[in-house]
Amino acid sequence: MAVLNINGLSYVADAPADTRLLWVIREHLRLTGTKFGCGMGLCGACTVHLDGEAVRSCQIELADAEGSRITTIEGLDPKGQHPVQQAWSELQVPQCGYCQSGQLISAAELLDTNENPTDDDIDNAMSGNICRCGTYVRIKKAIKEAVELKKQV
């Protein structure tokens, strides 16, 4: 059993210590915005923030997450007003939408660490996120729009 801080709330997870964080979030806590893609940490669909850093939750064991601040897509901004969420919506980025929670979490980390990312910065930050629909051009455009939206806040 572990106590987790997810999206600012305390949760008790009754699961073995080696259970992957992804399954604790989705199956035990029913926060289903974080997606299962590959299970190997390669696609980025399961990305969450762990103490502010974008990580693949399918690669993190429950025991390693205990005591950390975890943010899922549900907690990025519960009202959907984070600059990346606004830009994604305004520019209609998603096609199927499956990868988008991981894309948004990765983009949010980029903007937290780099106020004015270059195209190369964006490519590097987002390189671990695969979009099977190929919306990469829209994703990059939305990140640039989010930079501008963040400046207005």
Segments the model singles out, each with a brief description of its role:
Residues 1-153:
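Signature of N-terminal electron-transfer/Fe-S-associated modules in redox systems
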